[in-house]
Amino acid sequence: MVAKDLPRAAALSARVGWNQVAADWRVFLRDGAVRVVDDGDPDCLAASAAVLPYGRDLAWISMVLVREDRRRQGLATELLRWAVQRLAGTRCVALDATAAGREVYARLGFRDAFGFARWSVPDLPVTGGVRPMRAADWPAVLALDSAAFGAGREALLRDF
């Protein structure tokens, strides 16, 4: 994938009900690698997969998406194989799976480790003791995140 594909990648996310926008896809291009299937649709890519390595010890496979009209044609399997090969030598490769993708991942050797849920809350009022983050806070935030996540991801965090 190249930068000119960003709008069609964002369209793929939207079409399959995910929430990534072009800025999110830019992170994958900058910090990792993205492979897509372009079937000529001028508005939307057919399929995608991305990898985000965090050094040699940890990597995440992301954005394994297939447009509805192109499903059950082996695209997800092909893209997942590319991602796994791209990350060869990485100690731990992980991903999070939707119910639709779980079968594909299981066939390639991935197994369940934990679940997740997406939560949202309305904006809350700021109360005493809470302040915006300052530049001086970064070292402590990065140390805490690295300890909790298991790898450094400064570039990703600074994007938010």
Predicted feature residues:
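Conserved acetyl-CoA-binding loop-helix of GNAT-fold acetyltransferases
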Residues: M63-V66, R72-Q85, E103-R107
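Helix-loop element at the rim of GNAT/NAT acetyltransferase active sites that forms part
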Residues: A3-L6, A11-A23, L144-A155
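Short loop/turn motifs at secondary-structure junctions and domain boundaries
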Residues: W25-D31, D159-F160
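Amide-forming acyltransferase catalytic core, primarily the GNAT-like/NAT-type
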Residues: F110-F160
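Conserved beta-strand in the GNAT
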Residues: V36, D43-P53, D57-L65
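Conserved GNAT acetyl-CoA-binding A-motif
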Residues: A59, L80, R86-A99
